[in-house]
A protein has these predicted regions:
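Conserved N-terminal entry element of GNAT/NAT acetyltransferase domains
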Residues: 2-52, 211-229
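Active-site rim helix/loop that mediates acceptor-substrate recognition in acyltransferases
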Residues: 74-94
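Conserved beta-strand in the GNAT
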Residues: 97, 103-114
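Conserved acyl-donor/pantetheine-binding loop and adjacent beta-alpha core of acyl/acetyltransferases
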Residues: 112-141, 145
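Conserved catalytic-core motifs of GNAT/GCN5-like acyltransferases
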Residues: 114, 188-202
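Conserved acetyl-CoA-binding loop-helix of GNAT-fold acetyltransferases
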Residues: 142-157, 180
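Conserved GNAT acetyl-CoA-binding A-motif
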Residues: 159-171
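Conserved active-site alpha-helix within GNAT-family acetyltransferase domains
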Residues: 173-191
């Protein structure tokens, strides 16, 4: 179980979502942190802080061959919980479960890029936000689902902090599928660089481009196909 100190830390860092770099009054673990109804996929996208009750599902996702190929964390439950506990205790990172309607489907880490090791590789602004992501449920995969919920996530991040002008990702450089889908949403590849554990590509999206070109299509309108591909 989480220690009392870790529970306190976890409750406090949730407020980084709403108050930027400052901490505010705590919220209950398990509460919906942010949500957005996405007309493009006609589903409600919501976020909750991960907790111990999510561990079995998280382990199943990490042991999915499609996820393991890029995350390389097909570990035991004990080791997975150690990893998540470290993320929960990190005041600059929010480890989250993403939901489509009532279905938990994704693990997401939203973090302050200027406080992350990524800042050693690009000129990070103080309010740049970074994302790590995986989709664990096969039924929630596919390009239209991705366009919808990723647009909602980007919108929620920008709305949480008006000073955030950029969102960045650093996927493995050979993750062509993810980079193609992110490019559709305005996240352009800037350059490649080396982390100790991978060759990475820096993807970057901006607030201005997102609201001028992306959100009106994938965040505010119904999909023209009328179905999920």
């Amino acid at each position: 179980m989480l220690s009392a100190n870790l529970i306190k830390l976890s409750m406090n860092i949730v407020n980084l979502w709403a108050s930027g770099l400052e901490q505010d009054k705590p919220r209950e673990m398990g509460a919906v942190l942010a949500e957005h109804h996405n007309p493009y996929i006609n589903k409600r996208f919501s976020l909750k802080l991960i907790e111990r009750a999510d561990l079995a599902r998280f382990c199943r996702w990490m042991n999915d061959p499609r996820v393991e190929q890029f995350w390389q964390q097909a570990w035991s439950e004990e080791k997975q919980w150690q990893y998540l506990s470290e993320k929960l205790a990190d005041a600059h990172t929010l480890p989250l479960i993403g939901y489509l309607d009532e279905q938990p489907f994704a693990y997401l880490e939203v973090y302050w890029a200027a406080k992350d090791k990524l800042a050693q590789h690009y000129d990070a602004a103080p309010y740049d936000r970074g994302i790590h992501l995986l989709v664990g449920e096969q039924s929630c995969r596919g390009p239209e689902n991705f366009r919808g919920w990723m647009s909602s996530l980007s919108h929620l991040i920008y709305q949480s902090q008006p000073l955030t002008q950029r969102i960045v990702l650093e996927p493995r450089a050979d993750n062509a599928r993810l980079m193609m889908r992110m490019a559709e949403l305005g996240y352009d590849s800037q350059f490649e660089f080396d982390f100790p554990h991978k060759r990475a590509a820096l993807l970057m999206g901006t607030r201005a481009h997102f609201y001028e070109q992306i959100f009106t299509t994938f965040g505010e309108r119904k999909s023209p196909s009328g179905h999920l591909a």
